[in-house]
From Swiss-Prot:
Lineage of the species this protein comes from: Eukaryota, Metazoa, Chordata, Craniata, Vertebrata
Name recorded for this polypeptide: Tumor necrosis factor receptor superfamily member 3
Biased composition (Pro residues): 373-399
Gene source species: Homo sapiens
Glycosylation sites: 40, 177
Signal peptide positions (record): 1-30
Segments of skewed composition (Polar residues): 421-435
Superkingdom of origin organism: Eukaryota
Any single GO CC term annotated in Swiss-Prot or TrEMBL for this entry: Golgi apparatus
């Protein structure tokens, strides 16, 4: 359809004028700039504006990295200020404070990947080998990944640390022989590439085994050889036990000897005198007198038990010293005829060439007069070669003449006989008395 008027010369002249008029009309209408009134409590830009209910107006929000330092009013918009160091605000906000930056806690398994700024908080993630176990808007706690057993590997994920391992089997021609959360399956070794031959094929848990082409295979042990290797040591042990038991039964003295060795006290350990369990040694069956101790026998009556005073008692029949000839003439007693000392007797008993003394023994250690000096006597003092003067002699030392000391008169005693006169008395006995 053609418009002849619009294409005519007058139409072309009025066109720009009409467009300019419409532009002026559009510019004359007022635009809504915060703060502005809102009748339905909604603002045109919800991300950057907010509704202030006290004044019923829409106000501007503060951009990231700032906070509200002065609230808006009907005549003034919101005033913002930059966050201080170590604080942040990530979004458009109308907060009056900034949030504090927090470090990544290594105790909870976190590590830092980006520092904190005024527009962004600290960026944290789980440490290697761990996954996030607690998530609340962000990860707050990490735990160790589970191990994948041999023959498997952990499935790869787009986001590391978001979940626990999910183990999958190794592909054909690959193996994995450890238990690890991060181990990966490896391809089997190709023996021909190394100039070797395959000895054992690879599996999902082990690699291929290669060998030298000239190396012979080890012989496999048959079932018979394996049975002999088990039964021969067992039969040898049973034979040894049988021989030992036969020797033990045929020689019972071995048991007694072993028991005596076990009961013997170690060297240097003596009997305990306080224990009170000491017993005198028993007499030898063939030589009783040689091992009889010089101790009171339990059957003897002690002076303390009878209440009588103790006194040394020796039997009257103490044998005197005998000559060798007399000893040879004594009859020799047979071992069976030798007897022990009778209980309850004290004294000296000689039996079978031995002497047994029971009772108290008193030894006198005085000098012997008139006999030859003994081996323990002191040597005699030699006689001086010159005379010793008497005590009190005023003269010089030398030879002195003996003389009679003055004393009482001499008296003669007479013996009288019956019928005799003094004239015819018999011989007289002279007694010298010294006054």
């Amino acid at each position: 359809m053609l418009l002849p008027w619009a294409t005519s010369a007058p139409g072309l002249a009025w066109g720009p004028l009409v467009l300019g008029l419409f532009g002026l009309l559009a510019a004359s209408q007022p635009q809504a700039v915060p703060p502005y009134a809102s009748e339905n409590q909604t603002c045109r830009d919800q991300e950057k504006e907010y509704y202030e209910p006290q004044h019923r107006i829409c106000c501007s929000r503060c951009p990231p990295g700032t906070y509200v330092s002065a609230k808006c009013s009907r005549i003034r918009d919101t005033v913002c200020a930059t966050c201080a160091e170590n604080s942040y605000n990530e979004h458009w906000n109308y907060l009056t404070i900034c949030q504090l930056c927090r470090p990544c806690d290594p105790v909870m398994g976190l590590e830092e990947i980006a520092p904190c700024t005024s527009k962004r908080k600290t960026q944290c993630r789980c440490q290697p080998g761990m996954f996030c176990a607690a998530w609340a808007l962000e990860c707050t706690h990490c735990e160790l990944l589970s191990d994948c057993p041999p023959g498997t590997e952990a499935e790869l994920k787009d986001e590391v640390g978001k979940g626990n391992n999910h183990c999958v089997p190794c592909k054909a021609g690959h193996f994995q022989n450890t238990s690890s959360p991060s181990a990966r399956c490896q391809p089997h070794t190709r023996c021909e590439n190394q100039g070797l031959v395959e000895a054992a094929p690879g599996t999902a848990q082990s690699d291929t085994t290669c060998k030298n082409p000239l190396e012979p295979l080890p012989p496999e042990m048959s079932g018979t050889m394996l049975m002999l290797a088990v039964l021969l040591p067992l039969a040898f042990f049973l034979l040894l036990a049988t021989v030992f038991s036969c020797i033990w039964k045929s020689h019972p003295s071995l048991c007694r000897k072993l028991g005596s060795l076990l009961k013997r006290r170690p060297q240097g350990e003596g009997p305990n005198p306080v224990a009170g369990s000491w017993e005198p040694p028993k007499a030898h069956p063939y030589f009783p007198d040689l091992v009889q101790p010089l101790l009171p026998i339990s059957g003897d009556v002690s002076p303390v038990s009878t209440g009588l005073p103790a006194a040394p008692v020796l039997e009257a029949g103490v044998p005197q010293q005998q000559s060798p000839l007399d000893l040879t003439r004594e009859p020799q007693l047979e071992p069976g005829e030798q007897s022990q000392v009778a209980h309850g007797t004290n004294g000296i008993h000689v039996t079978g060439g031995s002497m047994t003394i029971t009772g108290n023994i008193y030894i006198y250690n005085g000098p012997v007069l008139g006999g030859p000096p003994g081996p323990g006597d002191l040597p005699a003092t030699p006689e001086p070669p010159y005379p010793i003067p008497e005590e009190g002699d005023p003269g010089p030392p030398g030879l002195s003449t003996p003389h009679q000391e003055d004393g009482k008169a001499w008296h003669l005693a007479e013996t009288e006989h019956c019928g005799a006169t003094p004239s015819n008395r018999g011989p007289r006995n002279q007694f010298i008395t010294h006054d």
